[in-house]
C-alpha cells in the first residue's frame, strides 16, 4: 500500500515521503491517526497545497521540543531510594518514578517518552533519554541517592547552629 506521509513517523519516513507499507499498518494506524494519505494523483496535488502548512506546524512542534530539551537538560533530578547492605537498591528506578521526579520540578513529561533499556538498579548518576520529538532527544541527568545519605547529611549543619545559640 503506497501512502504519502503527512507527518514525521518514526522508523518510516518524514513529511512528504511516499512510502510502501503493509495494508494493515496503513489502514489501522497511519490513516486513522491522520499521519498519512493514500498516494494517488489527486492526493499528490492536494498534499502539495497542504505541504507548507504541515511543514510550518512540524517546525513549530520541533522548536517547542527543542525548548523543552533545554529545560530538561538543565534540571538536576535527584531520586532518593531505600538501600540495603552494600548500597543495593530495594526495587529499581522506573520511568514512572523518573517522570514523577521531573514533574515535581515543574516540567511535565509523559512517562512513555522516557527511554530506558532497563530500570536503574544502582546508586549514582545516570543519563536518561527523553524523546520529545522524532528528531529531538533530551539527555536528563538523574542522580539516584540513598535515603540514609540524606538523613546523615541534614543533622550535621544543624549542630553548629545549636552550639552558636547555646553560646549566646
UniProtKB/Swiss-Prot annotation:
Region annotated Disordered, chain positions: 149-168
Similarity field: Belongs to the bacterial ribosomal protein bL9 family.
Protein's name according to its UniProt entry: Large ribosomal subunit protein bL9
Pfam families found in the cross-reference section: Ribosomal_L9_C, Ribosomal_L9_N
InterPro entries from the UniProt entry: Ribosomal_bL9 (IPR000244), Ribosomal_bL9/RNase_H1_N (IPR009027), Ribosomal_bL9_bac/chp (IPR020594), Ribosomal_bL9_C (IPR020069), Ribosomal_bL9_C_sf (IPR036791), Ribosomal_bL9_N (IPR020070), Ribosomal_bL9_N_sf (IPR036935)
SUPFAM superfamilies tied to this protein: L9 N-domain-like, Ribosomal protein L9 C-domain
Task performed by this protein: Binds to the 23S rRNA.
Keyword Ribosomal protein in annotation: yes
Bias type Acidic residues, positions: 152-168
GO cellular component: ribonucleoprotein complex; ribosome
GO molecular function: rRNA binding; structural constituent of ribosome
Keywords: Ribonucleoprotein, Ribosomal protein, RNA-binding, rRNA-binding
NCBIfam families for the chain: L9
GO terms, biological process: translation
Superkingdom of this protein's organism: Bacteria
